[in-house]
Amino acid sequence: MGNLNFVLSPLDQFEVRDLLSINANLLGNFHLSLTNIGLYLTIGIFLILTYSLLATNNNKIIPNNWSISQESIYATVH
């Protein structure tokens, strides 16, 4: 078992870290990076768009379960 003598600050969870970075010196010192926050936002947008596509009712009169759940979430938040 390892020796755990160090104490982590609670603020360490909010640190922005580079996960993937590209340095292009040919384009005038161009730096492009994907951070942990960018990854979380990308995953969140993907999940929301997938849920919205599943809840699309295709102009039917009677809503399906996905559509009802989406309307319930909208009514709760709005």
From Swiss-Prot:
InterPro entries: ATP_synth_F0_asu_bact/mt (IPR045083). It is a multi-pass membrane protein. The keyword NADP does not apply. One of its GO terms (cellular component) is proton-transporting ATP synthase complex. PANTHER family: ATP SYNTHASE SUBUNIT A (PTHR11410:SF0). This is ATP synthase subunit a. Mitochondrial membrane ATP synthase (F(1)F(0) ATP synthase or Complex V) produces ATP from ADP in the presence of a proton gradient across the membrane which is generated by electron transport complexes of the respiratory chain. F-type ATPases consist of two structural domains, F(1) - containing the extramembraneous catalytic core and F(0) - containing the membrane proton channel, linked together by a central stalk and a peripheral stalk. During catalysis, ATP synthesis in the catalytic domain of F(1) is coupled via a rotary mechanism of the central stalk subunits to proton translocation. Belongs to the ATPase A chain family.
